[in-house]
Amino acid sequence: MIKFLSALILLLVTTAAQAERIRDLTSVQGVRQNSLIGYGLVVGLDGTGDQTTQTPFTTQTLNNMLSQLGITVPTGTNMQLKNVAAVMVTASLPPFGRQGQTIDVVVSSMGNAKSLRGGTLLMTPLKGVDSQVYALAQGNILVGGAGASAGGSSVQVNQLNGGRITNGAVIERELPSQFGVGNTLNLQLNDEDFSMAQQIADTINRVRGYGSATVLDARTIQVRVPSGNSSQVRFLADIQNMQVNVTPQDAKVVINSRTGSVVMNREVTLDSCAVAQGNLSVTVNRQANVSQPDTPFGGGQTVVTPQTQIDLRQSGGSLQSVRSSASLNNVVRSLNALGATPMDLMSILQSMQSAGCLRAKLEII
């Protein structure tokens, strides 16, 4: 009896773990962020700003700012500034953002500044694609990196030419919203999936009545909603908390060709195959031989002749058997048995897919 109850509890937990809320799988069409961008100046740097002789736009921007403050710089003045840097400022305007609300901004150096650590961003207007100002940014920059240099040597950890200002911008203009207008809303799946779209529509129809949700395509589910903002908010809140059973994912292997990382999901399977992988290494060693005359006054000359030695080695290449694997653990165990490096594993997986032994989509990023 105890074993039966334990098995039943385990089954229920496993079943519940496969269910997810609709809000985690979809988003409401039209409810999205909007990108903002601006150009500004960072001051207060400890000698790590732009070299103004090489970045004339920094000096021009500073002159324009000073003229707006009533300060006139004589024409032709060569200002040797080290504590100022020209930067680009980016931010995201959240959906339903209201005037007075604060948002985070990212500050990135545009010139040849060495570091933005300790700098202060001066008031910078942030514009949208329509060239309208939607927010104003200003504040002290937090840089996550660190660095030091002395005597021709330098040490740097992480990036110093970019930083972030938490709540560094204030929204000054609101975006018009179409939410609450009309009797339909579209839910968009995060990943296109016909079966998942149909399952979400069926779940909504069972709770809200037949015809409440209609699948338009593999990513979009159209939902009939009551009119009015408050009614639609309550309706969406109920729908987004509904749970649906997640269908199995498509088997996929993602390869990052720049970093050499290989990631695969649990749906990946292997068929039996044989793999031979040989490693070829080429070593080039070059030395300079100096030949000098034995007699200092014999009229001979010192001759430098390069000597190059090339060593080519090939290892491995034996044929190894890869067993059919139906679970992710077995797939990992089979691939590890090959003893291949991540870079070698990329070509092996591509060859496996071409041979029909890798039951997965191969995506190279």
Swiss-Prot record:
Cellular component GO terms, alphabetical: bacterial-type flagellum basal body, distal rod, P ring; outer membrane-bounded periplasmic space
Major location category of this protein: periplasm
Subcellular location: Periplasm; Bacterial flagellum basal body
Signal peptide annotation: 1-19
Record InterPro entries: Flag_FlgI
Coiled coil: none
GO biological process: bacterial-type flagellum-dependent cell motility
Gene Ontology MF, one: structural molecule activity
Keywords from the named record: Bacterial flagellum, Periplasm, Signal
NCBIfam families: PRK05303.1 (NF003676)
Membership in a protein family: Belongs to the FlgI family.
Function, in words: Assembles around the rod to form the L-ring and probably protects the motor/basal body from shearing forces during rotation.
Quaternary structure, from the entry: The basal body constitutes a major portion of the flagellar organelle and consists of four rings (L,P,S, and M) mounted on a central rod.
Protein name: Flagellar P-ring protein
Biological source species: Shigella dysenteriae serotype 1 (strain Sd197)
Gene designation per UniProt: flgI
